[in-house]
Amino acid sequence: MKAVSIEAGEGSKAKRVHGVNRGISVFDLVLRIVALVGTLASAVAMGTADQALSFSTQIVNFEAQYDDIDAFKFFVVSNSITCVYLALSIPISIFHIIRSRAGKSRVLLIVLDAIMLVFLTSGASAAAAIVYLAHNGNTSTNWFSICQQYTDFCQRSAGSLIGSFGAMALMVLLIILSSIALSRR
């Protein structure tokens, strides 16, 4: 029997890069779906945060709602817009699974992902500052902590930050993955 030698040429290397890019594209799709769920959960959790104190009177109503604070409104809007963007970018991510060598659409996703990351970061940072003040107050300005009275509201608003900051980390990974796939093209 003769020994047959097989050379690894350009054809086998191209298939390997194509397979790696397809794997990156599948991971990109999964990360987009998880980030979408995180931003949706954050927007819903903050948007439904509401608590009234039990000793409210007919004249004075002690109630905490997300829409009383502009930073929380911005948080809900930024998470909602990012969630819609992620939903609209899923078909492009599926397209990248089918055609893993697509370049222009990857560049578009990198730019749009970066814009949405900045938007999401600004909303989450504004809300995080208010949640910090709600928990700790600021003694030099005589702002007192309200979380001893509004425990449910504070827990819900702080919990909504977790999904948003998680989605921010996933958006950073999405940008890195798209850049890697683009460089391997």
Swiss-Prot record:
It is found in: Cell membrane. Residues 1-25, 95-106, 182-185 are cytoplasmic. Signal peptide: none annotated. The chain crosses the membrane at residues 26-46, 74-94, 107-127, 161-181. GO terms for cellular component: plasma membrane. Belongs to the Casparian strip membrane proteins (CASP) family. This is Casparian strip membrane protein 2. It comes from Solanum demissum (Wild potato).
